[in-house]
Structures are given as structure tokens and as C-alpha cells.
């Protein structure tokens, strides 16, 4: 008689050979009941960030202001965030097995989860893995069982793992997604000013913006009134 399945996340690593940024979660699956033979599982997994499950330094809190507001609001604003939704076919096993769950990631800083990861300087990212799908079990044939949504596993991913993954694909760099017309305008500005790189282009724009934001001091006459 079958007794359901249990799931646990036993590790997470950056995949060095992936075409794009990819995390690999190692998941242990245990079959319960008298008959522990599983022919296959069509498994789905939703990953959520649980921001309320860790502490934050002042520097991290400042970086998270655009997501959660001021610290005074965090009692209401630190809500779970969707990170990814992936699927995998688990081969047959008897009793228990471990499988890799590859999760492609984005470095798009307009995505809330990416901005959250980038704001963290140390420690761990609290994640919740929620499983669903279909399991095929039975000694003499296939018995189809759903994997209910209440099957979940906690994972505390080191921030260093995220940074390692990003550095493998974007070493020492950040990434911004801009509308095509903005890129066209930037390209024209770079060309008109003969700038050697995009970095030099942005730095010059920032320098000019800061200069415009700081008005030149006004000279005073000997009587103390503006010249």
C-alpha cells in the first residue's frame, strides 16, 4: 500500500557548464508505505523567496527599499515572492532517490527576485520549494497518484552561491534592460561624443547630471548680498 512521497532539499549549487545562469537544487525524494517502488514522477516545482525568514543589515535594508519600503513597513510588506517554476521527470527508484532540479535564472534587475538577491551582502536566501505533479507507482502495474501542493521543502541558499552563478556569466558586471529607443539615444550620444565604451558613456552622463544638480555657489558682495 502506498503512503505518499516526502521531499527535502539537500543542497544547491551554481551550474558551471550551463549556457545561461542556472542554479541546481539537489532534492531527495522518499517513498512511504508498504510498497516503496516508484516507476516515475512527472514533477513540478514552484520556488518562492521567503524574505521574512532572515535578518537584514542597514546596507541591505537600504538596497531593499524599492521592494519593501522603509523598515517600519516590513511587518506588512515582506511577502513571499515568486522566483521560478520548473518541471522535471524523475526516473524510477525504490525507497528513495536524489535528483537535480535545474533552475534557469535571470540577471534582469527589473525582476523583483533578482533585485532582492542583488541587495543581499551575506548570509542565506530563504527559499520554499512547493511540489506537485503525478507519481506512477505499484508492484504489478501503474498506480497513478497526484503529488499534492502541500508537499514542500525549505532551502537556505547561501548568497555566495547566487554570486558565484552570476560571476560565471557576468564577471564583475551588472545588467540593465532598457527600451530600444533609449538604447538608440545612448548609442547616438556615445557616437557624437566619441566615447570608447558604454561604461564611459554612462559615467559622462552621470557626471553631467551631478554637475547640473549642484548649482554653482553665488558670490556675495562686501555688504553680504548676492553679486
Place the predicted regions along the sequence by residue.
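Internal, hydrophobic beta-strand segments that form the core of beta-sheet-rich folds
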Residues: 44-50, 98-150
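Low-complexity, acidic Ser/Thr/Pro/Gly-rich terminal tails and inter-domain linkers that flank the onset
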Residues: 1-24
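Short, basic amphipathic alpha-helical segments that act as recognition/interaction helices
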Residues: 196-217
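Short aromatic-acidic-glycine turn motif
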Residues: 47-59
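Short beta-strand elements
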Residues: 62-72, 136-175
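Surface-exposed, Lys/Arg-rich phosphate-binding patches that contact polyanionic backbones
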Residues: 180-197
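Extended, solvent-exposed segments with strong compositional bias
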Residues: 63-119
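Contiguous beta-strand segments within globular domains
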Residues: 16-29, 38-47, 103-107
Amino acid at each position: 500500500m502506498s503512503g505518499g512521497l516526502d521531499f527535502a532539499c539537500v543542497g544547491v549549487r551554481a551550474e558551471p557548464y550551463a549556457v545561461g545562469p542556472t542554479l541546481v537544487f539537489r532534492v531527495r525524494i522518499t517513498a512511504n508505505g508498504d510498497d516503496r517502488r516508484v516507476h516515475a514522477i512527472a514533477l513540478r516545482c514552484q520556488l518562492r523567496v521567503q524574505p521574512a525568514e532572515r535578518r537584514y543589515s542597514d546596507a541591505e535594508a537600504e538596497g531593499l527599499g524599492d521592494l519593501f519600503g522603509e523598515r517600519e513597513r516590513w511587518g506588512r510588506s515582506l511577502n513571499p515572492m515568486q522566483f521560478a517554476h520548473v518541471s522535471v521527470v524523475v526516473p524510477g527508484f525504490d525507497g528513495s532517490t536524489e535528483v537535480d532540479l535545474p533552475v534557469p535564472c535571470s540577471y534582469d534587475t527589473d525582476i523583483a527576485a533578482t533585485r532582492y538577491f542583488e541587495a543581499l551582502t551575506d548570509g542565506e536566501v530563504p527559499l520554499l520549494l512547493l511540489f506537485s505533479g503525478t507519481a506512477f507507482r505499484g508492484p504489478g502495474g501503474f498506480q497513478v497518484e497526484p503529488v499534492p501542493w502541500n508537499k514542500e521543502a525549505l532551502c537556505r541558499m547561501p548568497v555566495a552561491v547566487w554570486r558565484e552563478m552570476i560571476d560565471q556569466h557576468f564577471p564583475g558586471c551588472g545588467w540593465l534592460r532598457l527600451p530600444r529607443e533609449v538604447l538608440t539615444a545612448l548609442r547616438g550620444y556615445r557616437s557624437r561624443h566619441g566615447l570608447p565604451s558604454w561604461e564611459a558613456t554612462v559615467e559622462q552622463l552621470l557626471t553631467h547630471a551631478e554637475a547640473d544638480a549642484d548649482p554653482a555657489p553665488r558670490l556675495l558682495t562686501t555688504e553680504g548680498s548676492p553679486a
